[in-house]
């Protein structure tokens, strides 16, 4: 299932991440109440999946505080809005070496053991969690996911009954994911997310999507997103190539050139319009669960 242009398109909304800050766009949610409310608004606008990080309410910096994850999760669940919750496991994999010893992590590093990175997933049991099947250079650090750590995290996620969203930033990461699949750590149908336009990863181009989707296992389901100005062009490309899409303030803070997005819901609304204008349809939450083989 490498893409079917006739199927309904799942919209994921990445509500808040690590980089965008309220200083860049006041709409970026920070507190658990803001994150949950923004996720709920995005769901009402058409997002079947909401992908959530948490931030320190005082510093606005990304954090792995499980109490904040719990607060966000409970607020969304209490709202009565039906949406698929996707919690990140990305934090805890940032490494930069000390100037005096490359084998020692600098104070800017944030490295955690696998059990710490999935603790909130085990306790809160979202339907989906992200799994970054990737090691790559970034501007100031290495995004470092050791193969043994990925196996340990995958096993814990599988035992918890949570579906991993396999985030891949380049073609080699797909081969890494396939290795996990062949070793029995990832069940079918796999859900891949192509993360495009990020420094030193695959570019946000049609050619990159075609190459990456052609490498997937036959039953895999895929989605794609582009960061910043590439967000909406990649929505159109993914729809036309039979995939699903992701938008949100984690990846892009603009609604159009020079116009800040007033909310995550506004980005979802624009993505839904593109899908419909191209002759497609937006997947309901029930349809998304069916496509992803989720059992609620």
Q: Could you say what each language-model-derived stretch is?
A:
Residues 127-250, 261-266:
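Catalytic alpha/beta core domains of metabolic enzymes, predominantly
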Residues 2-27, 91-92, 97-100, 130-137:
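N-terminal small/glycine-rich loop or linker at the start of catalytic domains
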Residues 32, 69-144:
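Active-site beta->alpha loop and helix N-cap motifs at the rims of alpha/beta catalytic domains
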Residues 60-89, 152-159, 211-219, 265-275:
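Alpha-helix-loop-beta-strand connector modules within alpha/beta enzyme cores
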Residues 269, 273-296:
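Mid-to-C-terminal alpha-helical segments outside catalytic/metal-binding sites
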Residues 35, 42, 53, 129, ...:
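Conserved, mostly hydrophobic/aromatic
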């Amino acid at each position: 299932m490498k893409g079917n242009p006739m199927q309904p398109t799942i919209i994921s909304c990445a509500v808040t991440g690590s980089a965008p800050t309220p200083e860049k766009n006041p709409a970026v949610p920070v507190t658990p109440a803001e994150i949950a409310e923004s996720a709920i608004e995005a769901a009402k606008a058409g997002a079947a999946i909401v992908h959530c990080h948490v931030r320190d309410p005082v510093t606005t910096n990304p954090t792995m505080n499980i109490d904040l994850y719990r607060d966000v999760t409970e607020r969304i669940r209490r709202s009565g809005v039906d949406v698929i919750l996707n919690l990140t496991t990305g934090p805890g994999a940032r490494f930069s070496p000390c100037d005096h010893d490359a084998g020692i992590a600098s104070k800017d590093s944030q490295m955690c053991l696998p059990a710490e990175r999935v603790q909130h997933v085990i306790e809160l049991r979202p339907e989906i969690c992200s799994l970054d099947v990737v090691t790559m250079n970034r501007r100031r650090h290495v995004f470092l996911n050791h193969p043994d750590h990925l196996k340990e995290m995958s096993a814990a996620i599988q035992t918890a009954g949570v579906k991993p969203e396999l985030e891949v930033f380049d073609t080699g990461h797909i081969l890494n994911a396939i290795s996990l699949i062949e070793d029995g750590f990832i069940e079918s149908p796999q859900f891949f997310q192509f993360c495009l336009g990020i420094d030193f990863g695959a570019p946000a181009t049609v050619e990159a999507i075609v190459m990456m989707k052609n490498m997937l296992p036959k039953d895999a389901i895929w989605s794609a997103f582009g960061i910043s100005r590439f967000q909406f062009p990649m929505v159109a490309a993914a729809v036309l190539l039979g995939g699903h899409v992701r938008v949100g303030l984690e990846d892009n803070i603009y609604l159009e050139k020079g116009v800040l997005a007033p909310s995550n819901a506004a980005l979802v609304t624009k993505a839904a319009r593109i899908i419909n204008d191209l002759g497609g349809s937006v997947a309901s939450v029930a349809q998304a669960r069916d496509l992803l083989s989720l059992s609620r």
